[in-house]
Amino acid sequence: MAGDLHTHSTCSDGSVPIHRLPLMAARLGLSALALSDHDTTLSAQYAYDHPVQDGVRLIPAAELTGYDFQRSHRVHLLTFWPDLDCPALRRHCDIMRQRRNECALQSCREIEALYPQFRTEQALEYAQDSGVLFKSGIMQALQQLGLCDGIYTGLYHELFGWEPRGKCLHSPTYPPVREVLATAKAAGAVVVFAHPTVYKSMPLLRELVAEGAIDGIEAVSYTHLRAHETRED
């Protein structure tokens, strides 16, 4: 069975509407696809409602974000087959939606000052499916204005980069990673540590493995392979 267990749609920071992903997967010869958008139950709900589409088995998932305060790094946890009625999961998603939007709107105000032709309303068009304005949506609006030729370009790093820090970067406060783990477990999810080298999380990963706190590790992903190639950890 060939599948992709880590995907994003316009339910978070992806660029393709969720209903189009299964056909794209089928054309690639995949038979399974996990819909795992950031800190939302929207994609998991879609997968529960459409267990098979275009011949592809859809796996309900969510990628939850936490923070390793000991090492000052974000952590992404893929959670498969979560109980969407879990109060802790819903609370996590609600909090992250509010915090992300607050940060994104602050970034937009600063970008409006830098580029007078840009308007926040243009970027908000890309948040219609998710209810959350992500940096990718802001970049798509800037691309429409001819200010860049893609999402993850030089302008993205100038505005939102980490090292050096982008001039318009505002990051939400993330819950502690162990709190997020507890949320995932409360939802009955299978928990997989996503791309551990991307945010330099190998020390934390070793701790969690030793504790038996996670069910798996994402060993292959595009961002993971790039991080490995550039020896970020």
Task: State each model region's role.
Residues 52-207:
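Extended substrate/RNA-proximal surfaces in nucleic-acid metabolism proteins
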Residues 42-51:
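Metal-dependent catalytic neighborhoods of phosphoester/phosphodiester hydrolases
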Residues 211-216:
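Glycine-enriched alpha-helix->loop->beta-strand junction motifs that scaffold or abut catalytic
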